[in-house]
Amino acid sequence: LVGSEMCIRDRSRPWLYYVYAALAAAVFEETGRLIAMKFWMKKWLDFPNALMYGIGHGGVEAILIGGLSGISNLVSMLMINSGAMQNTLAALPAESANQTVSQLSALWTTPAPLFFVSGIERISAIILHIGLSLLIYRAVKAGKCRTAAFTAVLAYGIHFIVDFFAVAGPALLPIYVIEIGVFVMAAGTLVTVSYTHLRAHETRH
């Protein structure tokens, strides 16, 4: 945590923060996925359950990140429109009130389409989590250690690349390009893993 705080504060090296953020997400989430499927889900681990794991992971994340943020924005807008926000700001010290207004200004300065972009981002995240869950499932079920290791590393790598592109991309590209890129990578992962699984299933039968 200390390292992350230093990294976040050091804006002179933003790329170091981008690498850290993407790597941390990939390592913690994929390791958790791997442990869950290797040990906790050992008796029930099959393709449908791996699929549901990905849906659950992505769905809960969408609720916590997108849903709660949306509710917070909605409540703030209702308070502003009803005049309740003015009363709240009046009760705050001047410095705190100015900071609050600065934060709330994003609600009326942000272009409306960008609020829909966050929903598309969550859809892409759910698709990605499904694909990565199926990839880790294949790693756990792989008969050969080399194949299992390669598949697991592939999941870590894909997660890192997608997250790095998502956090570093806005510094170079328009947000719409970033979201399209993330969606393509997420969908590509899911389609490829599903196709590989179906081909392997057909070969066995």
Q: Which residues fall in each region the model found?
A:
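A loop-to-helix transmembrane entry motif
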Residues: A112-I126
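Functionally important transmembrane alpha-helices
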Residues: R122-Y195
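Transmembrane alpha-helical insertion/packing segments
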Residues: S4-E5, R9-F28
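Generic transmembrane alpha-helix signature in multi-pass membrane proteins
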Residues: A22, R33-W40, Y53-G54, I65-S69, ...
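Transmembrane alpha-helix/helix-exit interface in multi-pass inner-membrane proteins
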Residues: I55-N98
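Juxtamembrane helix-boundary/capping and inter-helix hinge elements in multi-pass membrane proteins
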Residues: W40-P48, K141-C145
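Membrane-helix boundary elements
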Residues: P93-F116
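Conserved small/polar residues in nucleotide/adenosyl-binding loops
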Residues: L1-D10, T196-T203
